[in-house]
Amino acid sequence: PVELREAIRELMTKPAFWWMTAGATVAAFCGYGISSFQSIFLVRAHEITTGEAAIWINAPVSMSSAIGTFATGWLATKLYKKHPGAIAWVPALGLALSIPFYVFAFTTQNLLYAALGLIIGGFVKYGYIAAQYTIGQGVVSMRVRATATAVLLFIANLIGYGCGPLFIG
């Protein structure tokens, strides 16, 4: 087993790891904030019940987000052969593309359009999840991969879960 000090020392020499962690943390901050605020917003703005929000909006959004994670990972892997940077820029493009869909979803007066904005936004946004693990483990030695993942998740979840819902809600 690798000592924590040795693992942290290696991580400190990997700027790509820290840039990716920063990006994943910002994405988690927004994602956790949106997901915790989304149901309350739908209930208040569109006068639906929490059950209706959960079944008719949040379930399809969750499904599209999961599919988007796999689709983005697949696309980035496919493009990686010719464009090694695709593992980073494909998910980054998805994050950027999600912004207008989320803005639209939270500003439209039409519930169907709001649902579509959230579904499409979730599909393109959550592709970063596949990339964060690929990059996080790809820039360190095999002996440090588990620690790298733990550090990434600790930082992203501490700030994402800890501050995202509070700030956005």
Where are these regions (language model features)?
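Flexible cytoplasmic inter-helical loops of multi-pass small-molecule transporters
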Residues: P1-E6
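Paired intracellular helix-loop junctions of major facilitator superfamily
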Residues: Y80-K81, G136-R145
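Extracytoplasmic gate region of multi-pass secondary transporters
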Residues: K14-F70, V124-Y133, Y161-I168
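Loop-to-transmembrane helix entry/capping segments in MFS-fold secondary transporters
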Residues: T50-A54, M142-L152
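Helix-to-loop junctions at the C-terminal end of transmembrane segments
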Residues: G68-P84
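Primarily residues marking transmembrane-helix entry/exit sites
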Residues: T13-T21, L111-A115, R143-A146
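Alpha-helical transmembrane segments of MFS and MFS-like solute carriers/permeases
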Residues: R9, W18-A27, P60, F101, ...
